[in-house]
């Protein structure tokens, strides 16, 4: 009897607590609807676009008021001037430096509240820097992630020197392009994401290198400023040219503040004097690729003439250094039209005229350039150099596919000993990005990351296959993931870690920038059969945390189902009327009251504005009749 009484008493207390919890939730829901109904149109859109409304019943009215005040006051700006002028933050500021890879997840969680943020970190020889730019009014979202991997075998002090001189340039380029994007709608050239792998035979001591080039280099830069000829620009060392090609549009004011060491000052002066001539080379991304390839080829030829054959071979045996930089830029297509390959650009213009105002579309360009210094030693004669400059890119291989709304273009070309791999992916965003970066169900963010990682994997596949082909007779290779067009294949949550192959006496390239990302079992089998491939610190790059955080898996539908903010806002709205007293919203099952705002769908069904907006961000049909809110032609957002 006593046990039965105690059990009954416990169940009564449990049911009472559940009843109280339900009552509290109902009170919070009522307060939520009251708060939303009292918001004006601007405040409502501000909170909705920044994902601050949350779920009814799970957030109190006081918390909603606090969020509204916080977003109105504005987030603490990351001070663009401070980012430009402080070279310390580029190489990992102590306040932002974090050895924990999960810190980038915290940064992503704060994007929806802070708007524009910058975060950087470093772990061992790998450093990363992430920049977010959001515009709640237009819906544009730009996410840039730079991953720098420095590996050396020999002098352990060289990575820090090279990083201190390279990272400020990369950061200045990023900030400069951001500023131009906000002030002018004109496209900016350096938004093409580049990953350059340059391998050379450097001198054995960094001090010796600085002394040997200072007098001749200054005279060469003076001649370059006068003549603006690519022949005179080419005498910079390959690593310096890699920096110059990735930050050609750095303005003089930003680079002056980045002076720190003597090595950095040499790099800054080179950028300042070459900034005028670099503007002439900005046409299309393909034109810039060929000009950069020609400069790199001629520069290595000049170096090989100034050094003897024995010196070059002995330096190659004693020391080798590889620097890899991977930058991913996601931006609005209107500001990226000039930096896209011609195949995608022509189709973009054709669709632009037919659709009118479009929602934001993310364009992702991934470029990997692999320089093979061994090829340059065979081009020491004037005849060979002339032939390499005049040859046409007749060995370009291009593959284009479209499936599930994703247009993907792959191309591989070789000119003057420089192989360029380009993967362009156009990602339409048909749903609102304000579903929250902190929610693992964000299909849009999952799709973006999957496409980024797949792009790295396909470029890596290109480079793997080209290792076994003759450089003089390349064969067309199509990535296995692109042949069937399977955009929803499983992507393993692994980062684009650097791939290191065992050194061979014949092949001069020993490292590549790619991705340990498999999009099919065939690719995994192909990579495993090669053998001898090792991955260094695969878990230390932020992409591992990103992939795990967003739970990338093949069960998600790559085709976004919801409507964009612009499409939702174009639907008609009205205020509560006398005839609405006994009507009920079918989403929240709540009667309309005085002060409610109602949104009317084309099928004539009406709902609370905040209720139907949340529904339409995930769906494109009416909750009652299941009719499409927009016709297929109006929902098309591929540009």
From Swiss-Prot:
Pfam families (alphabetical): zf-RING_2 (PF13639)
Record's compositionally biased regions (Basic and acidic residues): 213-228, 372-382
Keywords of the record: Developmental protein, Metal-binding, Nucleus, Transferase, Ubl conjugation pathway, Zinc, Zinc-finger
Reactions accelerated catalytically: S-ubiquitinyl-[E2 ubiquitin-conjugating enzyme]-L-cysteine + [acceptor protein]-L-lysine = [E2 ubiquitin-conjugating enzyme]-L-cysteine + N(6)-ubiquitinyl-[acceptor protein]-L-lysine
Zn finger limits (RING-type): 585-626
Comp. bias intervals (Pro residues): 473-482, 493-506
EC number: 2.3.2.27
Keyword Zinc-finger set for record: yes
Comp. bias intervals (Polar residues): 110-138, 147-166, 244-253, 290-302, 349-358, 383-399
GO (cellular component) term, any one: nucleus
Compartment(s): Nucleus
A single GO BP: protein ubiquitination
Pathway where this protein functions: Protein modification; protein ubiquitination
InterPro entries xrefs: RING_finger_E3_ligase, Znf_RING, Znf_RING/FYVE/PHD
GO molecular function: DNA-binding transcription factor binding; identical protein binding; ubiquitin-protein transferase activity; zinc ion binding
SMART domains assigned to the protein according to its UniProt record, in alphabetical order: RING (SM00184)
Ranges where the record places region Disordered: 1-28, 67-403, 467-534
PROSITE patterns registered for this protein in UniProt: ZF_RING_2
Biased composition annotated in UniProt, kind: Low complexity: 11-21, 269-286, 303-327, 335-348
Family to which this protein belongs: Belongs to the RNF12 family.
Subunit-structure text: Forms homodimers through the C-terminal region. The N-terminus interacts with the homeobox of LIM/homeobox factor lhx1/lim1, with lhx3/lim3 and lhx5/lim5, and with the N-terminus of ldb1.
PANTHER family recorded: E3 UBIQUITIN-PROTEIN LIGASE RLIM, SI:CH211-59O9.10
Function field: Acts as an E3 ubiquitin-protein ligase specific for ldb1, mediating ubiquitination and proteasome-dependent degradation of excess ldb1 in a RING-dependent manner. Does not degrade ldb1 bound to lhx1/lim1, nor lim1 itself and thus contributes to the establishment of proper ldb1-lhx1/lim1 stoichiometry and the formation of a ldb1-lhx1/lim1 complex. Interferes with Spemann organizer function and suppresses secondary axis formation induced by ldb1 and lhx1/lim1.
Protein name as annotated: E3 ubiquitin-protein ligase RNF12
Organism whose genome encodes this protein: Xenopus tropicalis
């Amino acid at each position: 009897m006593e046990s039965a009484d105690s059990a009954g008493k416990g169940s009564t207390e449990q049911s009472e607590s559940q009843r109280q919890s339900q009552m509290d939730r109902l009170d919070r829901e009522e307060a939520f609807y009251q708060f939303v109904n009292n918001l004006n149109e601007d405040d409502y859109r501000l909170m909705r676009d920044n994902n601050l409304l949350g779920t009814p019943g799970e957030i109190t009215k006081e918390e909603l008021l606090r969020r509204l005040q916080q977003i109105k006051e504005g987030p603490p700006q990351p001070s663009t001037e401070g980012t430009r002028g402080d070279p310390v933050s580029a190489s990992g500021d102590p306040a932002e430096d974090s050895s924990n890879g999960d810190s980038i997840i915290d940064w992503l969680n704060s994007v929806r509240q802070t708007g524009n943020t910058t975060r950087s970190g470093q772990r061992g020889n790998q450093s990363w820097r992430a920049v977010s730019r959001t515009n709640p009014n237009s819906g544009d979202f730009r996410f840039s992630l730079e991953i720098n991997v420095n590996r050396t075998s020999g002098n352990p002090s060289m990575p820090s020197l090279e990083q201190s001189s390279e990272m400020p340039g990369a950061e200045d380029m990023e900030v400069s392009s951001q500023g131009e994007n906000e002030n002018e709608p004109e496209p900016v050239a350096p938004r093409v994401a580049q990953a350059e792998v340059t391998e050379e035979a450097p001198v054995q001591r960094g001090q010796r290198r600085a002394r040997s080039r200072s007098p001749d280099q200054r005279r060469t830069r003076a001649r370059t400023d006068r003549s603006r000829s690519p022949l005179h620009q080419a005498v910079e060392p390959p690593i310096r040219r890699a920096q110059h090609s990735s930050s050609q549009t750095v303005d003089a004011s930003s680079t002056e503040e980045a002076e720190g060491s003597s090595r950095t000052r040499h790099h800054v002066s080179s950028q300042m004097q070459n900034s005028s001539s670099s503007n002439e080379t900005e046409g299309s991304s393909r034109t810039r690729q060929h000009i950069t390839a020609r400069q790199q080829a001629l520069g290595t030829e000049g170096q090989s003439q100034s050094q003897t054959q024995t010196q070059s071979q002995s330096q190659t045996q004693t020391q080798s250094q590889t620097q890899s930089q991977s930058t991913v830029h996601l931006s609005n297509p209107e500001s990226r039209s000039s930096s896209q390959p011609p195949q995608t650009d022509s189709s973009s213009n054709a669709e632009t005229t037919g659709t009118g105002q479009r929602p934001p579309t993310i364009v992702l360009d991934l470029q990997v350039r692999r320089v093979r210094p061994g090829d340059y030693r065979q081009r020491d004669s004037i005849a060979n150099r002339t032939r390499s400059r005049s040859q046409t890119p007749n060995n370009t291989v291009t593959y284009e596919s479209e499936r599930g709304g994703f247009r993907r273009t792959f191309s591989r070309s070789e000119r003057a000993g420089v192989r360029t791999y380009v993967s362009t992916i156009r990602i339409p965003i048909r749903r609102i990005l304000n579903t929250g970066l902190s929610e693992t169900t964000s299909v849009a963010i999952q799709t973006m990351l999957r496409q980024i990682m797949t792009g790295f994997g396909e470029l890596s596949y290109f480079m793997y296959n080209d290792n076994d082909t003759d450089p003089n007779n390349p064969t067309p290779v199509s990535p296995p993931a692109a042949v069937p067009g399977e955009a929803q294949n499983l992507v393993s949550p692994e980062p684009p870690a650097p791939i290191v192959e065992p050194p061979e006496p014949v092949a001069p390239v020993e490292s590549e920038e790619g991705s340990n990302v498999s999009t099919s079992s065939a690719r995994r089998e192909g990579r495993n059969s090669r053998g001898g491939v090792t991955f260094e610190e695969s878990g230390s790059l932020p992409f591992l945390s990103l992939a795990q955080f967003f739970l990338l898996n093949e069960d998600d539908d790559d085709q976004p189902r919801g409507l964009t903010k612009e499409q939702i806002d174009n639907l008609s709205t009205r205020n509560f009327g006398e005839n609405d007293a006994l009507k009920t919203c079918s989403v929240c099952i709540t009667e309309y009251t005085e002060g409610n705002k109602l949104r009317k769908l084309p099928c004539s069904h009406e709902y609370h504005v905040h209720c139907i907006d949340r529904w339409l961000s995930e769906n494109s049909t009416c909750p009652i009749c299941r009719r499409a809110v927009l016709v297929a032609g109006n929902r098309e957002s591929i540009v």
